[in-house]
UniProtKB/Swiss-Prot annotation:
Gene Ontology MF terms in the entry: rRNA binding; structural constituent of ribosome
Lineage top rank: taxon: Archaea
Subunit relationships: Part of the 30S ribosomal subunit. Contacts protein S4.
Family recorded in the similarity comment: Belongs to the universal ribosomal protein uS5 family.
Gene that produces this protein: rps5
Start and end residues of each stretch annotated as Disordered: 1-22
Protein name per Swiss-Prot or TrEMBL: Small ribosomal subunit protein uS5
GO cellular component, one term: cytosolic small ribosomal subunit
InterPro entries, per database record: Ribosomal_Su5_D2-typ_SF, Ribosomal_uS5, Ribosomal_uS5_arc, Ribosomal_uS5_C, Ribosomal_uS5_euk/arc, Ribosomal_uS5_N, Ribosomal_uS5_N_CS, Ribsml_uS5_D2-typ_fold_subgr
Bias kind Low complexity: ranges: 7-18
Domain S5 DRBM intervals: 63-126
Functional note: With S4 and S12 plays an important role in translational accuracy.
Swiss-Prot/TrEMBL domain comment: The N-terminal domain interacts with the head of the 30S subunit; the C-terminal domain interacts with the body and contacts protein S4. The interaction surface between S4 and S5 is involved in control of translational fidelity.
Species name: Methanosphaera stadtmanae (strain ATCC 43021 / DSM 3091 / JCM 11832 / MCB-3)
Keywords: Ribonucleoprotein, Ribosomal protein, RNA-binding, rRNA-binding
Amino acid sequence: MSKRSNRSNNKNNTNKFNIENWEPKTELGRKVKDGEITDIDQILDKGLPIMELEIVDALLPDLEEEVMDVNLVQRMHKSGRKVNFRVIVAVGNRNGYVGLGQGKSQEVGPAIRKAVDAAKYNLIKVRRGCGDWGCGCGRRHTVPFKIEGKMSSVSATLIPAPAGVGLAIGNVGKTILSLAGIADVWSMCSGQTQTTINFAGAVFDALKQLSSVKSSEKDLKALGVID
């Protein structure tokens, strides 16, 4: 049984992270609390592993959460049939940062919390620009160039689109791209895209691949890319 959801779990003031109450357990966490690190890019650009969720909460306080899928998973165990909920969650600040995660538990609430935590640990920085040569607006509204991502049987290709086109992709892709701060894109998708975990994974992989493409500073500037 699978249930898709676009329910937003935006943080409200009552759940706002209080850095003063945080006791970091890692050197990276201590640098964040002490103010030595003030920008998430100082971590992501160096490929440093995020081992404490509070690092993300402190540096990206405007992060939003979207539950995309709640799936009931059954498996046989020697003690009988075991039932778990598997939840897929995306997080993002709608301005260049997005994460994807899944969580499993016998109850929906704990599964959602696990998925949110996993998405924060998987947070990435997304390259954006104006990659459609017919547009030339110079704003960061689309992907800077054509890129492909894969997950299991699903392949998702994202193509730059002019401003105003919107997100020409399935709802799962729309959720991830909008959380990443991308407003316009063409797409070509194949495989079992009705499987949320694979479709979401393919789109997320495409966004990760954007940063692995080597381009000259001149070309990136022409595409309006800001790393």
